[in-house]
């Protein structure tokens, strides 16, 4: 009998796409949280506020990546147990993960409130936007508990094959976010603080909704009294996956943060261009990023169920799908780079538009590289090799950071040199990841024979 959310049966390509589509839409809505702030702030307040929100978003993603990494790693464990049909281990891992990530959330919150000022100074945030950026982040982190709750339960539901339910709660919260943005900024004139407050309240709605749904509609995922224990084997498994995935996410966002610091040194105009272009960039490769996450769940469930033949067929199918889609998006972004920048920037801000268009055309030409890299990350996490995902992340980000600082320092490089360092990092990690997959695939098949 086919279980709800079972990814070990059915056609591979159809199963992957059916599972991925709600995740893509959900990620689109997640991006809309910050896009709503960026769009309204940029058009209604000005370039300084746009630069503040854009830089704040980069720092916010880096800090929250700790929680997202823990949730993602736990989700892999959930998928393995669900695929194997071990519901006792599944419930115990849910309880242990919830407590672990909850404690980390509290620690992170306290750390941000204590060290936010020194962090902003370390990032060379210009004085004219320092106050706006500080107040924005302070409000955002007052609601970090909502970020933890939503992402934990969304990860849990996706791990057991339900990618639709998290989408519904996000849809409601995004509509609320945009409405509150307009009300707080245009009607109450709260400025950048209003944008932050709107995001926190909207995330609170999503968090409350998803936790109520899970407890009422998915009783098999609700832990019982006997599950409320810290089993050593369970904790070791969660720690192994979650810690390495957390390290991967943190390293990834640390590299981005270091590049943000370098970009900040070029002034407010370049910061504003980077903030707007990164939002467009995130939307452009967001579908293949979510496809990689869905692919990871697919692989993990089949790995837990021992369906190794299905895993290898899934790899081939996913690779072709990701490459075709990435090439299509590359063409669209390259052709429409300037109109896309005008969504966030006023037409008279020509310097910002020119810098942003250059960024988009360089990155857009290589979306195939990041698409393949997301598949490699997901594959290695799912087959109990999260360490390899970390290696690829360090390789990609390390190359990116070293090259960006070097190219920015030479006369021929400058800001454009920073942009070129990003796809070069993707491609180097792709080559290593694919080579190791081909080697490991042979060993993997041999060991399971």
Where are these regions (language model features)?
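Transmembrane helical elements of multi-pass membrane transporters/channels
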Residues: 18-37, 139, 150, 173, ...
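Helix-terminus/linker motif at the lipid-water interface of multi-pass membrane proteins
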Residues: 28, 32-50, 120-127, 183-190, ...
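Small-residue hotspots at the loop-to-helix junctions and early N-terminal turns
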Residues: 47-58, 137, 196, 268-283, ...
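Small-residue-rich hydrophobic transmembrane alpha-helices
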Residues: 50-110, 147-166, 273-337, 370-392
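Short runs within selected transmembrane alpha-helices of multi-pass transporters and secretion channels
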Residues: 71, 139-158, 166-174, 195-210, ...
């Amino acid at each position: 009998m086919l279980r709800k959310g079972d990814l070990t049966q059915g056609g591979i390509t159809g199963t992957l796409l059916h599972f991925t589509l709600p995740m893509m839409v959900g990620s689109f809505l997640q991006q809309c949280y910050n896009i709503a702030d960026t769009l309204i702030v940029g058009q209604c307040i000005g370039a300084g506020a746009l630069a503040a929100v854009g830089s704040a978003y980069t720092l916010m993603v880096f800090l929250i990546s700790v929680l997202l990494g823990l949730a993602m790693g736990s989700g892999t464990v959930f998928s393995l147990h669900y695929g194997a049909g071990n519901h006792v281990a599944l419930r115990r891992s849910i309880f242990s993960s919830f407590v672990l990530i909850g404690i980390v959330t509290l620690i992170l919150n306290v750390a941000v409130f204590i060290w936010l000022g020194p962090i902003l100074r370390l990032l060379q945030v210009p004085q004219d936007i320092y106050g706006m950026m500080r107040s924005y982040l302070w409000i955002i982190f007052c609601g970090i508990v909502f970020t933890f709750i939503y992402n934990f339960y969304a990860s849990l539901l996706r791990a057991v094959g339900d990618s639709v339910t998290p989408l519904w709660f996000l849809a409601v919260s995004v509509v609320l976010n945009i409405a509150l943005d307009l009300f707080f900024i245009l009607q109450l004139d709260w400025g950048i603080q209003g944008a932050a407050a709107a995001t926190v309240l909207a995330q609170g709605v999503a968090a409350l909704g998803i936790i109520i749904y899970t407890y009422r509609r998915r009783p098999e995922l609700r832990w019982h009294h006997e599950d409320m224990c810290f089993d050593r084997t369970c904790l070791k498994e969660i720690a192994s996956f979650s810690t390495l995935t957390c390290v991967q996410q943190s390293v990834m966002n640390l590299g981005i943060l270091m590049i943000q610091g370098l970009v900040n040194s070029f002034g407010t105009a370049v910061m504003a261009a980077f903030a707007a272009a990164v939002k467009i960039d995130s939307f452009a490769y967001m579908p293949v990023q979510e496809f990689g996450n869905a692919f990871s769940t697919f692989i993990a469930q089949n790995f837990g169920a021992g369906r190794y033949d299905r895993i290898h067929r899934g790899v081939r199918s996913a690779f072709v799908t990701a490459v075709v889609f990435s090439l299509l998006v590359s063409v669209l972004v390259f052709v429409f780079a300037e109109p896309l920048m005008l969504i966030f920037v006023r037409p008279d801000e020509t310097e910002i538009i020119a810098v942003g268009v250059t960024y988009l055309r360089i990155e857009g030409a290589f979306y195939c590289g990041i698409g393949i890299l997301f598949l490699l990350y997901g594959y290695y996490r799912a087959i109990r090799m999260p360490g390899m995902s970390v290696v690829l992340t360090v390789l990609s980000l390390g190359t990116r950071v070293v090259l960006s600082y070097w190219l920015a320092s030479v006369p021929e490089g400058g800001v454009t040199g920073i942009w070129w360092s990003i796809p070069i990092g993707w491609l180097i990690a792709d080559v290593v990841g694919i080579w190791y997959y081909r080697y490991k695939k042979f060993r993997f098949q041999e060991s399971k024979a």
